[in-house]
């Protein structure tokens, strides 16, 4: 069957081929317009923007404008940047405009491709969001590609960390806005915590182009963006529990590296209970009694911190802080924190100051944020391996765009060694040989620890090299830019999201920026530019003669996509190149995913010390292992999305209601309806339908009415009246409360009353929504255990989350009614104050436990840096610079004492 399928594909072409062929017909139409565009003056070319907008206003659709609009952008790029869109780039632009994903190999000019679809869609006036993975790329692309848009009369904005509301609002008001996924998501959440429409910064979600779309929509799909605020300090408890873990043995817990879980055994539970009692942490009962449930939570986090999380792989300790390492990019994620107490457990383990836990105030996943856009598209070098996920979850098709020139890179079969030592020896020998003949080498590692191990080995061999990983990311763009220089050896943790091309001979733009900075004399500038260009061209020829860039992988990642990204760094724009992975049976993927058969086979082959096995069968076996992991991760993400959709429906309902309330000049009808519903609920609870009068709880009703409506009525005598029923009681309460509120309105005036009602309604809604989020978090963790009772956790979650939502609405009605009824008004109009925004955090959800584990503190906050912000130095002699110091942390003055026994003494 497979051979028949392959034959049919050769005969008729694949689905991808057929769709690309259809686009090629439109490319010819665009090319036919090029002479006309060349003939236009700059002003006439710029005038096309107004012409297109007028045609749209007259009823034209974007597809009708596409050929001419793309031709205009191509000509503008030639005049402003000196770059002309290739035909394949025009195809990429059409794929984006159709709301799909364009897979384009490294070096094919994805950044330039985005300008085509961005310009066309910006003509509608709804705004276009171009999404990048970091601030550096957002600013670079806004400055660089912005030249095209500004040439054509469009405004370009960029949303960066640290901007205030006014700057953000201006950026979003532009025709095209550049920014990171975090910034867009946080701005959406913050907008939904505002109290006035004029304070909001975003203006809708029309069209988004997501660069590195696989990184953002797949790798970070389980990373909710969460706005949170600090809770109470529990440093002592974290430290006390941390001291328990070293006292338990391997027999006391079960560790599953594949599933990334660790649990106490029955013997381990007994051992921990004994230690906790001896230390006075747990006074009575057993570990799983309800009064000890918080201790279980702390023990589990401490166990995970010690047994699952490795220093220099999962995190590093830097300037007294535990900093998370992104497993996909190898970058430090400064400010990000694991949630639910895990980060505090790591801080206790490493004996650094323990920061307080945080409470969720608002959250959204990238999956649900980006699905809000009317049209979504993306670009990446590697998406086909995840095509089914893009289709199932986002409704996006992935199209592979042909390369401008055929790929000349040779991807060699993996070399598999018995031990890590043998693998490194072979790798070092290969690197030495390449460096000696001038071939540039890029070595990809999966962790900081491994990159530094390799660096030490190269130092011993006196091989010059540079290291690119999370510790030195400030210099990464310049290091990558020079990775194609002949003889250069560059070691890098996973290359995802680097965003800078590796050009053979070196990066011309970066060298010119560095070496011509400050030169004002035009003749000197021209001379220096020519000198740099000649030097780079000579070095490029040497690198080409040596075989082009050689990419070496030190082990396979569990995602084929990450491996493909590393390979794709070589062979850009038809350049020659090579790639090879060096593996050992001690590698994580090989060790965890069943290499017993492979080990047995290597032994039977009688491999000698330092020998490797190279065979296509090895590559296929590893690919199958990777496919299994990818399929499992996809299932996990789909399952998590089902749970998050429940919260997303509720979030959308609350946020939409908030917007309606802010838009409304008068919310009195809403408040009146709430008050009447509260009265209905009170009467139903105390005067049951079809019950006799002597069964009515009139004393209870009187008490409730006094508490919620601030009315002292002779309710207890009503039951004695002849023929009275619950309907009449309800009507009497309606009338009495209406008169009560009317008198308040008369006292302060209708305008002030309307302001008070809106302020109370919005602030009470926010408070209850925060509490509701916390309850949903607890519910999400609790329902996971119900599978053991043969009950579907998702159905349980849906049912109970709905009940919680109904409870939220009931409490909201009751509290709004009570606050307005009992309030004593002054005659001065109250101001609806914008609340100071808490620190921003992006939590990472453990795909196996469903717990949110990562918090992104200080990401995209509008506030000035806190005094204890990583970017603000603390002066030991100036307590004003210390910020909020936990009482059990070392005192910042340097005395060596705890803060509570030094400057923090009460």
From Swiss-Prot:
Pfam family, one: SecA_DEAD
E.C. code: 7.4.2.8
Residue numbers binding ATP: 89, 107-111, 501
Compartments where located: Cell inner membrane; Cytoplasm
Record's cofactor remark: May bind 1 zinc ion per subunit.
Catalytic activity: ATP + H2O + cellular proteinSide 1 = ADP + phosphate + cellular proteinSide 2
Keyword annotations: ATP-binding, Cell inner membrane, Cell membrane, Cytoplasm, Membrane, Metal-binding, Nucleotide-binding, Protein transport, Translocase, Translocation, Transport, Zinc
Protein's GO biological process: intracellular protein transmembrane transport; protein import; protein targeting; protein transport by the Sec complex
GO MF annotation list: ATP binding; metal ion binding; protein-exporting ATPase activity
One GO location term (cellular component): cell envelope Sec protein transport complex
Membrane topology: Peripheral membrane protein
UniProt KW Cell inner membrane keyword: yes
InterPro entries the record matches: Helicase_ATP-bd, Helicase_C-like, P-loop_NTPase, SEC_C_motif, SecA, SecA_CS, SecA_DEAD, SecA_motor_DEAD
Residues binding Zn(2+), per UniProt: 891, 893, 902-903
CC cofactor: Zn(2+)
Family: Belongs to the SecA family.
Subunit structure comment from the entry: Monomer and homodimer. Part of the essential Sec protein translocation apparatus which comprises SecA, SecYEG and auxiliary proteins SecDF-YajC and YidC.
Function, in words: Part of the Sec protein translocase complex. Interacts with the SecYEG preprotein conducting channel. Has a central role in coupling the hydrolysis of ATP to the transfer of proteins into and across the cell membrane, serving both as a receptor for the preprotein-SecB complex and as an ATP-driven molecular motor driving the stepwise translocation of polypeptide chains across the membrane.
Name the UniProt record assigns to this protein: Protein translocase subunit SecA
Source organism per UniProt: Parvibaculum lavamentivorans (strain DS-1 / DSM 13023 / NCIMB 13966)
């Amino acid at each position: 069957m497979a051979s028949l399928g392959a034959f049919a594909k050769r005969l008729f072409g694949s689905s991808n081929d057929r769709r690309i062929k259809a686009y090629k017909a439109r490319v010819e139409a665009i090319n036919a317009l090029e002479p006309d565009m060349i003939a236009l003056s700059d002003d006439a070319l710029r005038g096309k923007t107004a012409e297109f907008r007028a045609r749209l206003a007259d009823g034209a659709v974007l597809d009708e404008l596409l050929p001419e609009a793309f031709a205009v952008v191509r000509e503008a790029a030639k005049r402003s940047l000196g770059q002309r869109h290739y035909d394949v780039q025009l195809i990429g632009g059409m794929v984006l405009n159709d709301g799909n994903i364009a897979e384009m190999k490294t070096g094919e000019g994805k950044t330039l491709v985005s300008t085509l679809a961005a310009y066309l869609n910006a003509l509608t006036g709804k705004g276009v969001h171009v999404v990048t993975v970091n601030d550096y790329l957002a600013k670079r692309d806004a400055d660089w590609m912005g030249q095209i848009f500004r040439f054509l009369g469009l405004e370009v904005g960029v949303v960066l960390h640290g901007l205030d509301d006014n700057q953000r609002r201006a950026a979003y008001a532009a025709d095209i806005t550049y920014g990171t996924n975090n910034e867009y998501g946080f701005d959406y959440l913050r907008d939904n915590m505002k109290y006035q429409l004029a304070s909001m910064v975003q203006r809708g979600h029309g069209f988004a182009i997501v660069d590195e779309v696989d990184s953002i929509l797949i790798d970070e799909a389980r990373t909710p963006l969460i706005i949170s605020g600090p809770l109470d300090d529990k440093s002592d408890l974290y430290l006390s529990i941390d001291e328990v873990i070293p006292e338990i043995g391997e027999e006391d817990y079960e560790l599953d590296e594949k599933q990334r879980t660790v649990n106490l055994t029955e013997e381990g539970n007994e051992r921990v209970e004994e230690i906790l009692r001896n230390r006075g942490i747990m006074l009575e009962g057993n570990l799983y009694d309800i009064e000890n449930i918080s201790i279980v939570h702390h023990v589990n986090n401490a166990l995970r911190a010690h047994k699952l999380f490795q220093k220099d792989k999962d995190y590093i300790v830097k300037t007294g802080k535990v900093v998370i390492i992104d497993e996909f990019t190898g970058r430090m994620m400064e400010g990000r924190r694991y949630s639910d107490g895990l980060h505090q457990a790591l801080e206790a383990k490493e004996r650094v100051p323990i920061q307080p836990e945080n409470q969720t105030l608002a959250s959204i996943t990238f999956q649900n944020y980006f699905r809000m856009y009317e049209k979504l598209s993306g670009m990446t070098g590697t998406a086909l391996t995840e095509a089914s996920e893009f289709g199932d979850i986002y409704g996006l098709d992935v199209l592979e765009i042909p390369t401008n020139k055929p790929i000349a890179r040779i991807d060699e079969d993996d070399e598999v060694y018995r031990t890590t030592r043998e693998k490194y020896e072979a790798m070092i020998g290969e690197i030495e040989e390449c460096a000696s003949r001038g071939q540039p080498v890029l070595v990809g590692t999966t962790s900081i620890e491994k990159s530094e191990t390799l660096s030490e080995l190269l130092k011993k061999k006196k091989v010059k090299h540079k290291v690119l990983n999370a510790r030195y990311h400030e210099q990464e763009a310049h290091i990558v830019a020079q990775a194609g220089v002949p003889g250069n050896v560059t070691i890098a943790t996973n290359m995802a999201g680097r965003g800078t091309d590796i050009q053979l001979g070196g990066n011309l733009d970066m060298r010119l920026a560095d070496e011509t900075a400050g030169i004002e004399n035009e003749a000197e500038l021209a001379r220096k530019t020519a000198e740099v260009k000649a030097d780079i061209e000579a070095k490029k020829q040497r690198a080409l003669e040596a075989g082009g860039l050689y990419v070496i992988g030190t082990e396979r990642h569990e995602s084929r996509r990450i491996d493909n990204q590393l390979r794709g760094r070589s062979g850009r724009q038809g350049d020659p190149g090579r790639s090879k992975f060096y593996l050992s049976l001690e590698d994580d993927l090989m060790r965890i995913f069943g290499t017993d058969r492979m080990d047995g086979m290597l032994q039977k082959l009688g491999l000698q010390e330092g020998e490797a096995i190279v065979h296509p069968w090895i590559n296929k076996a590893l690919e199958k292992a990777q496919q299994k992991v990818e399929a499992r991760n996809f299932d996990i993400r789909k399952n998590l999305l089902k749970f998050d959709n429940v919260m997303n429906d509720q979030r959308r309902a609350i946020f939409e209601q908030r917007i309606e309330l802010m838009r409304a000049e008068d919310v009195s009808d809403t408040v009146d309806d709430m008050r009447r519903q509260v009265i209905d609920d009170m009467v139903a609870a105390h005067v049951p339908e079809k019950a006799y009068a002597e069964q009515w709880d009139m004393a209870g009703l009187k008490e409730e009415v006094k508490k919620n409506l601030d009315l002292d009525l002779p309710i207890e005598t009503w039951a004695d009246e002849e023929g009275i029923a619950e309907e009449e009681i309800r009507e009497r309460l309606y009338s009495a409360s209406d008169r009560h509120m009317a008198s308040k309105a008369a006292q302060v005036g209708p305008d002030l009353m309307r302001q008070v009602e809106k302020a109370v309604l919005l602030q009470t809604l926010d408070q209850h929504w925060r509490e509701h989020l916390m309850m949903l978090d607890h519910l999400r963790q609790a329902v996971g255990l119900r599978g053991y009772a043969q009950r579907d956790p998702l159905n349980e979650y849906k049912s109970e989350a709905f009940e919680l939502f109904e409870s939220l609405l009931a409490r909201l009605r009751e509290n709004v009614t009570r606050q307005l009824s009992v309030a004593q008004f002054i005659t001065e109009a109250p101001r609806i104050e914008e609340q100071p925004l808490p620190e921003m955090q992006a939590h990472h959800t453990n795909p196996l436990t469903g717990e949110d584990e990562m918090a992104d503190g200080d990401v995209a906050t509008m506030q000035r840096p806190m005094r204890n912000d990583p970017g603000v130095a603390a002066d030991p002699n100036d307590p004003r610079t210390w910020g909020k110091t936990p009482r059990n942390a070392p005192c910042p003055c340097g005395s060596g004492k705890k803060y509570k026994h030094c400057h923090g003494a009460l």
